[in-house]
Curated annotation (Swiss-Prot):
Molecular function, one GO term: RNA binding
The species this protein was found in: Cucumber mosaic virus (strain M48)
Family according to the record: Belongs to the cucumovirus capsid protein family.
Taxonomic placement: Viruses, Riboviria, Orthornavirae, Kitrinoviricota, Alsuviricetes
Protein name stated in the entry: Capsid protein
Free-text note on domains in this protein's UniProt record: The N-terminal arginine-rich stretch does not seem to be the major RNA-binding region that allows formation of an infectious ribonucleoprotein complex.
Magnesium as UniProt keyword: no
Function text: Capsid protein. Probably binds RNA and plays a role in packaging.
Main localization (coarse): virion
Region (Disordered): 1-28
Xref: SUPFAM superfamilies: Positive stranded ssRNA viruses
One GO CC term, this protein: ribonucleoprotein complex
UniProt keyword list: Acetylation, Capsid protein, Ribonucleoprotein, RNA-binding, T=3 icosahedral capsid protein, Viral nucleoprotein, Virion
Amino acid sequence: MDKSDSASAGRNRRRRPRRGSRSASSSADVNFRVLSQQLSRLNKTLAAGRPTINHPTFVGSERCKPGYTFTSITLRPPKIDRGSYYGKRLFLPESVTEFDKKLVSRIQIRVNPLPKFDSTVWVTVRKVPASSDLSVAAISTMFADGASPVLVYQYAASGVQANNKLLYDLSPMRADIGDMRKYAVLVYSKDDALESDELVLHVDIEHQRIPTSGVLPV
């Protein structure tokens, strides 16, 4: 073998590692694409799971969205017999309803027991037909149809149950203050008769600014 053949053979031997490194790079590209696809699927899953009126989420305290404030309504359910129901539409103060076209982004409901509370209640916010009289039969049907996600609040010896709040996102619906009368807070007293002095419900409605506070309450 002459020198030219020897040099050619040497060059061929030197190319093999480069072919190997290109193969490793190709493998890394494939892994990166797989990882990117997995992240994309995860993002879609998370986006689909963000809270809506039908899929609420537990919250603590959150800052209002920029340009938004909130109005609070306090509800004290009257005595509710064991296995019975209570419903109350969301009627905001006149000072707020005069701005009926202001958008509503979220509704937060907070359940706070009074000292005598030692039972279990189911609580939800639900859009109800204008024709509904919120009778026991009507509310019972709403709880039974499976379309009403609920906060199950149980007696906690230490005081307030850790998860005592639900946040409903109304942004996709473009709901406004004028629409709030179409929504109601519903309560089901599951195990015992609920006395009128046992429970307080705070409903915080986050809407476009009619300036007051900037933080949803704890």
